[in-house]
Amino acid sequence: MPRPVTVIDSNVTNAVHQVMDAMQAPVYFETYIIKGKNMNHLTWEVVDSIRKNKVCLNGRVNNSLCGGARKELDLFASLVDCFNLNGQPSRHENVDIVVIRENTEGEYAGREHEVVPGVIESFQVTMTKFWSDRIAKYAFEYAHFSKRKKVTAVHNNGKYEKLADAFFLESCQEVAKMYPNITYNEIASRETRAIRRHSNSKSLWAIIANIASGVAGGSFGDDYAIFEQVGSVGNHKNPVALLFSSVMMLRHLLLPLFADRLKTAVTRVISEGKCGNSNTTTQEVVDSVIANLD
């Protein structure tokens, strides 16, 4: 039976439609166009569709678009898949990292208000034990089911939020004991040269995702999931990032054979150098991906 998916339309979502049709993937889309005054947030109509379908593919590059939905749908885990692509130059080699962070507390809570006209106060919500435990369990569960051998907790070494860091690490250490087959370690910002170059920033998780060339990602909760291209590689013409996010979506929908076919086809097209040319049209990339489907 076809799986329903809510789609937030963009210039590249039609590419996903075409490739899914070519694969005869058992999914169908409910498409919504976000424009005008709704560009920075999801309408209730879209949120209701996500509640019904459980899965959303966000074609928009605007990172703030789904901010409200993360809280409304309790999408507590952000996941960014970082990996090298043959045919694409990269500062780092042999990258295969999944970056997971808490999506609804701490610096990503997005709590702010206007104290008096012209003065905005922005503040963070300290990590609670419940949310610290939950994101730690999510990371180890993901590592377990994806057959990854190591989980690394990245923290600020108490430089900015000493109590919050201690809280987070305590949760990770407790959860790690339940997964003896997974190696657990901790890295402070001062121990990583790449992070130290950005030591004035608190967003270590975002920095790592960008340095490691995050391609595809999503936000996940117990009941719902939104898949989207990573903001740093979002492109209004090139559909590759959204196609890789669609690979993640297909795995989430328990359609691994279709996910493997799509990932193989996109990887082939990239290795052949058919995506790096600025003169290449979206349709040419789509046609090449379809031609490479097994």
UniProtKB/Swiss-Prot annotation:
Please give the function described in this protein's UniProt entry: Performs an essential role in the oxidative function of the citric acid cycle.
Q: What is this protein called?
A: Putative isocitrate dehydrogenase [NAD] subunit-like 4
User: Superkingdom of the source?
Assistant: Eukaryota
Which family does the similarity line name? Belongs to the isocitrate and isopropylmalate dehydrogenases family.
Q: Which gene encodes it?
A: IDH4
**Classification via InterPro entries:** IsoPropMal-DH-like_dom
Tell me the Pfam families matching this sequence.
Answer: Iso_dh
Record-linked SMART domains:
Iso_dh
